[in-house]
UniProtKB/Swiss-Prot annotation:
Belongs to the globin family. InterPro entries: Globin, Globin-like_sf, Globin/Proto, Hemoglobin_b, Hemoglobin_oxygen_transport. Heterotetramer of two alpha chains and two beta chains. One of its GO terms (biological process) is hydrogen peroxide catabolic process. It comes from Xenopus borealis. Red blood cells. Heme b binds at residues 63, 92. PROSITE patterns: GLOBIN (PS01033). The keyword Heme applies. This is Hemoglobin subunit beta-1.
Amino acid sequence: MGLTAHDRQLINSTWGKVCAKTIGKEALGRLLWTYPWTQRYFSSFGNLNSADAVFHNEAVAAHGEKVVTSIGEAIKHMDDIKGYYAQLSKYHSETLHVDPCNFKRFGGCLSISLARQFHEEYTPELHAAYEHLFDAIADALGKGYH
């Protein structure tokens, strides 16, 4: 299912409250700790051998912020998310060889981080809207693999 007008409205009305630095660090840290095989893409980040090391790693924090900032920019291009992510998709597929399933996994981790931030405001309806967005982004980033 694609993004509906209502999804877009919900996302646009809440994304401004997201702190890319905080949410990015938490979501990427959660991905790296929950799915340890994803750490192979981040060997330059140094020690990722414990939860404490992952969640206090400055490179994890910086990259998480970069990813969430990119999602904020993608929200401005919801009519053409595939176009927005075309070059990044190519880079992830041809240069980094990232397993495209990891994009979906990151979306799940990001959903958890958003739920922790928004609490009661993160209704099932808002959760669904963000899942639709993260699915569209995962699809766009995975496009280079097809």
